[in-house]
Design a protein with these regions (language model features):
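Generic C-terminus detector
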Residues: 227, 542, 556, 566-607
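Structural motif
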Residues: 68, 96, 294-296, 342, ...
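Glycine-rich oxoanion-binding loops at beta->alpha junctions
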Residues: 71-84, 274-287, 310-346, 493-509
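Active-site phosphate/pyrophosphate-binding segments
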Residues: 260-264, 268-296, 386-515, 588-607
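Hydrophobic alpha-helical scaffolding
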Residues: 8-11, 100, 120, 136-139, ...
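Glycine-rich phosphate-binding loops that contact phosphosugars or nucleotide phosphates
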Residues: 287-439, 519-559, 564, 582, ...
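Conserved short alpha-helical segments that host acidic/polar catalytic motifs at enzyme active sites
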Residues: 1-246, 250, 262-293, 305, ...
């Protein structure tokens, strides 16, 4: 989820345009920034770790005239945040400079090949591999060279490339990563999103997957995946900057909810091989699962609820004792830890202090530690024995949505990986579990298309003051996350309970005007959930069902969020997306600040 900008124009103000554009995409989150521009002496790169201000201060006394350049803000995925790992990247001969958003899956094998040919690398990134490969394959023509490069690499990407032999142009391409072209008067632009170039143009071409585009100040030439020159539609953008920074969405939260299909696909593509086997050998090097007899999953808030889903997966698939604990309590619960214990610590930011302290405690007791985090180079990833990164990209809204689903999906894949290592999962079942991930993505897309139905429900419940979220089995874990979302951004008191536990006290609180969200994705327990619904309906509750097709729940509730079957283990994840929408639209109707709810912080760094 990096920020990209490129410029080719008749005015020698490329550096100014690039720095201004990068400032406009700071909202996406980043850990370093850099630009490359063409001068009379060749290509010059300037880049700095940290905030864009560091780069600006570094360059404040520079006097540079340049008509072509590219700029980038980086969110690290390969190589920790440092000056040398920041983009852009040179080839060894400095004839090529390149920026990249995405992940190159087979970079290691290409890097090995280039090293054997004597190429010297100056960073730890997958991106530099592409710059070096482009230089090696260069045949004097930018387009034909790029096509040769693209045939060698696998992954998701948006590239912008400049070459010293063609000082007036950029060549760019995209594959499952956003890239647009902005059209101006004797100046043209490329960017990852509209906000970077809105000051200069509102005429935008949205490139499609497989497109390659050559950009000069006066010409834009687009080739499609079949290498045919095509004319893409030019669209007039009517957004203002604030809207553009959110990609046209009203809030970051709904934008991030709707990025989940892309994240599901990316996670599947990056963490499975061509045969769709989970490939965590590198991430889990040194961990012998035959020696593990107990697993702990430790986290806070939404990450903890993702951990509950992970616990369910592992207990069902592995037959190993798996425990979850809240990080602030873990050290004080006297967990039984030996050198046969695997302790998994989940933190979006990688800086959650309770989780860090719990990991320190587990290491001291002899546990093998695994971090699951969204931020490369964060404290938790440096201190754990092993790390698996979620691929959610920066999450701006305080209420977590896409980070949750990416954490759950990583733990799902981890369960399959361990199960395969231990011989616990039959091949036909393994392939079904993997194929369910693609099914989940398709069904999230379908749910997004039906979101206005959930908006209509939100209009009816917006004035409710108290509520309960109920579920059985894995759905009780769904209830917890759904309840948290409603609390976080609506300030409605809600409580999540196992549905069968309601009658043991809490049913005394059910009366007219109380909201009950009843969740049922396991049809074996559907009739029991229906019975619980009838109990609360008889006492005046307004009941919203959240269930999969085939459930009896729609027959007995006031409103329903119905989702398609995405497999036994992943349908609950789809249901959570529906509950994210319910919380979002309720907050929208109440007029609250969806992205910045009161009293909450994105990263909790104090105990």
């Amino acid at each position: 989820m990096c920020g990209i900008i490129g410029y080719s124009g008749s005015n020698a103000n490329a550096v100014e345009v690039l720095l201004e554009g990068l400032e406009k995409v700071e909202y996406r989150g980043y850990d370093s920034a850099g630009i490359a521009f063409v001068t009379d002496s060749g290509i010059q790169i300037e880049k700095k770790e940290g905030k864009l201000e560091n780069l600006k201060n570094h360059m404040k006394n520079f006097e540079i005239l340049s008509c072509t350049g590219i700029g980038h803000t980086r969110w690290a995925t390969h190589g920790v945040p440092t000056d040398r790992n920041a983009h852009p990247h040179y080839s060894e001969s400095k004839d090529v400079a390149l920026i990249h958003n995405g992940i190159i899956e087979n970079y290691a094998e290409i890097k090995k090949e280039l090293l054997e040919q004597g190429v010297k690398f100056s960073s730890d990134t997958d991106t530099e591999v592409v710059a070096q490969l482009f230089s090696k394959l260069y045949d004097g023509d930018l387009y034909s060279t790029l096509k040769k490069v693209l045939k060698r690499i696998r992954g998701t990407y948006a590239f912008a490339i400049i070459h010293k032999d063609f000082p007036d142009r950029m060549i760019c391409c995209r594959n499952h990563s956003p890239l647009i072209v902005g059209l101006g008067d004797h100046q043209n632009f490329i960017a990852s999103d509209v906000s970077a170039i809105l000051k200069y143009t509102r005429d935008i071409i949205y490139l499609e997957d497989g497109d390659v585009v050559l950009v000069t100040k006066d010409n834009v030439t687009v080739y499609d995946k079949d290498e045919k020159e095509v004319k893409r539609e030019v669209k007039k953008v009517e957004w203002n900057f604030e809207q553009a920074s959110k990609g046209g969405y009203a809030h970051f939260m709904i934008k991030e909810i709707e990025e989940q299909p892309e994240i599901i696909e990316k996670t599947l593509n990056v963490y499975t091989d061509k045969e769709k086997n989970v490939k965590f050998d590198e991430q889990l090097e040194g961990t012998n699962f035959h020696d593990i007899d107990r697993i702990y999953i430790v986290a806070c808030g939404t990450a903890y609820y993702a951990g509950l889903q992970g616990q369910y997966f592992m207990k069902k698939l592995l037959g190993i004792d798996v425990f979850t604990d809240i990080a602030s309590e873990f050290r004080y619960n006297d967990p039984v830890i030996t050198n046969k214990t695997l302790a998994i610590f989940v933190s979006q930011s990688g800086e959650t202090i309770d989780t860090l302290m719990s990991m320190k405690y587990a290491k001291e007791k002899g546990a093998r530690t695994l971090a699951i985090s969204n931020v490369l180079g964060s404290t938790i990833t440096r201190e754990a024995d092993n790390v698996i990164y979620t691929l959610a990209g920066p999450e701006i809204s305080v209420a977590s949505t896409k980070a949750y689903s990416s954490q759950v999906l990583v733990m799902y894949l981890l369960s399959l990986y361990i199960g395969a290592k231990l011989g616990k999962i039959e091949e036909k079942d393994y392939q079904k579990y993997i194929s369910d991930i693609s099914l989940l993505k398709e069904n999230v897309v379908k749910l997004i298309s039906e979101k206005e139905k959930i908006h209509d429900i939100a209009k009816k419940i917006k004035d409710i003051k108290n509520g309960f979220y109920l579920g059985r089995g894995i759905d009780e874990k769904v209830a917890r996350e759904g309840s948290l979302k409603m609390k976080e951004i609506n300030y409605i008191h809600t409580e999540a309970l196992p549905a069968g536990e309601l009658k043991h006290g809490s049913i005394a609180l059910i009366e007219k005007g109380v909201l009950v969200v009843a969740i049922s994705t396991n049809l074996e327990m559907d009739e029991k959930v229906v019975s619980n619904i009838k109990e609360v309906k008889a006492r005046g509750a307004y009941v919203v069902g959240a269930c999969k097709e085939g459930s009896l729940v729609p027959e007995v509730v006031d409103d329903v969020i119905q989702v398609k079957d995405s497999g036994e283990l992943l349908t609950p994840v789809l249901t959570v997306v529906g509950l994210q929408y319910l919380a979002y639209y309720t907050s929208l109707e109440k007029g609250f600040d969806v992205d910045k709810p009161r009293n909450l912080a994105k990263s909790v760094t104090v105990e």
